[in-house]
């Protein structure tokens, strides 16, 4: 196959092989998501307190391949000299090692089952609930199967650093076959840059690379401060192992499940990056013989990459990267075929061992999200308040200017095959994306770390770029919007070579040996990705009337407040509540990741009903007080290791390992309903005006990340166009309305 790198083309025209038929919708599709969970963008927060039980609930008794390339077991902590938390803004230097935080507890069985029923009640019919309650009671009865499994879980807790980590990782990520873009990998959009030329863009890219390697070195030598809790149980240390994995992990497709690889045992090979431009791939050295290249030397290599591609007159490279966006088991099969060629094995190893991927993209056309832009304009003309669904109204009036929704599509999936989706390698943890018009960001593979860890690293990287530490003479392009102080990275520890770049390193073009079978698979992957991209309904809502400062003055947890607003918006859209996911960080425990904060409770349902029928003010306020107090209690339970979902997952998997028949609690329809998250949410706070978004986790659901700033809130809303029941436009309107009404409800207490 021959491709012209200087023009865009329809990939399908170049293939005459077998075409895969479009998959037909199937009711069974929903079942794929019942245990998939969420993309777990972790909210850091900590509280103290005793186990909280639902109001009015009866008491229940309960017993107290390293790069050959094989997956590496997680380690609870590693020797460090220091460690930080910009999340908590509280730090303590630890001269010897990270503190050994406690193990994640196994919650009491009765506690978990009681809360499970509390969350089931508002999402089941009364007859279904009674049936589910009987099944739960049977499972939890004294000397019953639940207690037997619980006893084995406690033994597992005593034997392992984290009793649920491997089960959770498999269930939420590695066993899920869905494509990574939209379904798993979040996209992060940075503050908009002003590039006067390609050289400006390249300088910014070099700074991203240099600052990332600075951060990687700090992680390796233990030069981070220990993340610590900032609320109740203040200063309690948090587990730091997620930082270790950000620049040294790779998600390899495999059968029957993916593998999360570590390259820490191959440190000498983990000193380069891979650069994509117009689907061409290059290896670019950053450390040579133990010495870091200078800013000018890295810049020269990146300039050479762009020059070589723009002047290239040979056959176009096969767009192998598009296959990383396909179904994971399909990509695993394709990878096996690729690896059958020795040259391809070398290229795969280069990609798998790189520190990060750098993608120079073509900007998506403004028409890409024209339907969203048009509906935004229509929405804005109907409103006279200062709330809007975009950064600036003028963006919508200027059809030649890309908006941030367009940029969000660019970071999440690349826009499809004929745009940039093949200019990616979605398996790699960190992919920086840059475009000539100044929209830059990140697409990151989620299995190795939570969003807050990645965001903290990225914000320190962006702040270091804005500082004098990394400014080179004659370079004026600095990030906008970084107004809050973040620790500036220290000077790099590697010695810098000053030798001419030609004598140190030049970019190496990565060549693939592609068979007709792989050509057909690339075509099929392009078809699949394009359908996925076309199906995504994505929208940014900037709510400008107030932010977290108002919520705090109203003596409310901002997170609980926003969760109630999301519930009210969903209730207005659909006339009911739904199983809701919000990630809750469990990093105060060893190898902690996240549990699920659920907002679907009878108390929230009662408040939503009162709001919709415009009940008397006193009634609405009283029910709000009850609902938000309970929501805060649920948050407390989760971050203290008393969540429901992780424990149920452990009970289910432990039963399998014991060889027991599947308990009815896990086969009953109520369990499927409980895990069908039509509302998948997460708080992703940033200091700069950056934001992170993702797709829904079920076909008839919404994705809703939120970033509460002091005086405004940024929501990233997503749904699927193929679902007639969902609409981000309508959901966004009802979310604005909910926030307006909640302000009216609480204004009297705010001084």
Model-identified regions with their sequence ranges:
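Long, Pro/Ser/Thr-rich low-complexity/intrinsically disordered regulatory tracts in eukaryotic proteins
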Residues: 2-5, 10-428, 437-438, 445, ...
């Amino acid at each position: 196959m021959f491709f012209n790198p200087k023009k865009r083309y329809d990939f399908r025209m170049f293939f005459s092989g077998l075409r895969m038929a479009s998959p037909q919708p199937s009711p069974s599709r929903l079942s794929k998501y019942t245990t998939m969970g969420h993309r777990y963008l972790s909210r850091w927060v900590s509280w103290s307190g005793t186990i909280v039980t639902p109001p009015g609930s009866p008491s229940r008794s309960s017993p107290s391949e390293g790069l050959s390339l094989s997956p590496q077991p997680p380690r609870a902590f590693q020797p460090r000299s220091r460690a930080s938390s910009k999340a908590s803004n509280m730090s303590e230097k630890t001269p010897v090692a990270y503190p050994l935080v406690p193990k994640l507890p196994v919650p009491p069985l009765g506690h978990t089952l009681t809360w499970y029923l509390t969350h089931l009640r508002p999402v089941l019919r009364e007859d279904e609930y009674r049936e589910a309650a009987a099944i739960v009671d049977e499972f939890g009865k004294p000397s019953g199967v639940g207690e037997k499994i619980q006893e084995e879980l406690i033994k597992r807790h005593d034997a392992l650093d984290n009793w649920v980590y491997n089960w959770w990782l498999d269930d939420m990520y590695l066993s899920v076959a869905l494509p990574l873009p939209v379904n798993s990998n979040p996209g992060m959009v940075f503050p908009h840059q002003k590039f006067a030329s390609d050289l400006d863009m390249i300088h910014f890219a070099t700074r991203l690379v240099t600052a990332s390697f600075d951060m990687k070195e700090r992680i390796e030598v233990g030069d981070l401060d220990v993340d610590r809790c900032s609320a109740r149980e203040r200063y309690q240390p948090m587990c730091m192992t997620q930082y270790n994995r950000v620049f040294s992990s790779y998600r390899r497709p495999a059968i029957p499940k993916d593998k999360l690889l570590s390259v820490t045992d191959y440190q000498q090979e983990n000193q380069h990056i891979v650069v994509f431009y117009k689907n061409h791939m290059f290896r670019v050295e950053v450390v040579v013989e133990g010495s870091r290249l200078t800013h000018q030397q890295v810049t020269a290599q990146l300039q050479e990459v762009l020059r070589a591609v723009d002047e290239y007159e040979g056959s176009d490279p096969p767009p192998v990267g598009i296959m990383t966006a396909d179904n994971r088991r399909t990509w695993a099969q394709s990878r096996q075929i690729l690896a059958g060629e020795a040259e391809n094995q070398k290229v795969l190893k280069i990609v798998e061992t790189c520190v990060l991927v750098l993608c120079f993209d073509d900007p998506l056309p403004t028409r890409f999200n024209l339907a969203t832009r048009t509906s935004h304009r229509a929405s804005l003309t109907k409103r006279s308040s200062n709330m809007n669904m975009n950064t600036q109204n003028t963006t919508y009036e200027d059809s030649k200017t890309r908006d941030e929704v367009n940029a969000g599509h660019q970071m999440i999936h690349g826009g499809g095959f004929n745009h940039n989706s093949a200019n990616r390698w979605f398996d790699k943890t960190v992919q920086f994306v840059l475009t000539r018009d100044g929209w830059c960001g990140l697409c990151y593979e989620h299995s190795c770390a939570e969003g807050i860890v990645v965001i903290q690293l990225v914000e320190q990287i962006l702040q270091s770029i804005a500082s004098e530490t990394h400014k080179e003479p004659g370079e004026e392009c600095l990030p906008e919007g970084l107004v809050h102080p973040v620790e500036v990275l220290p000077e790099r520890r590697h010695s810098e070579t000053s030798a001419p770049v030609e004598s140190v390193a030049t970019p190496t073009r990565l060549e693939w040996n592609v068979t007709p079978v792989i050509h057909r698979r690339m075509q099929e992957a392009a078809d699949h990705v394009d359908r996925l991209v076309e199906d995504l309904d994505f929208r940014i809502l900037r709510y400008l009337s107030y932010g977290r400062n108002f919520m705090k003055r109203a003596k409310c947890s901002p997170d609980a407040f926003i969760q109630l607003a999301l519930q009210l918006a969903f209730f207005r859209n659909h006339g009911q509540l739904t199983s809701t996911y919000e990630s809750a960080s469990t990093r105060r425990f060893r190898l902690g990741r996240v549990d699920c904060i659920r907002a679907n409770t009878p108390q929230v349902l009662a408040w939503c009903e009162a709001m919709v029928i415009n009940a008397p003010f006193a009634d609405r306020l009283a029910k709000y007080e009850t609902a938000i107090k309970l929501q805060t209690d649920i948050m407390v339970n989760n971050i203290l290791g008393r969540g429901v979902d992780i424990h149920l997952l452990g009970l289910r998997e432990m039963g399998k390992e014991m060889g027991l028949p599947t308990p009815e609690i896990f086969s009953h329809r109520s369990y499927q309903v409980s895990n069908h998250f039509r509302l998948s949410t997460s708080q992703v706070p940033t200091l700069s005006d950056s934001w992170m978004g993702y797709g829904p986790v079920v076909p008839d659901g919404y994705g809703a990340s939120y970033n509460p700033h002091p005086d405004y809130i940024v929501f990233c809303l997503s749904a699927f166009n193929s679902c007639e029941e969902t609409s981000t436009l309508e959901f966004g309107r009802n979310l604005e309305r909910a926030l307006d009404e909640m302000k009216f409800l609480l204004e009297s207490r705010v001084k």
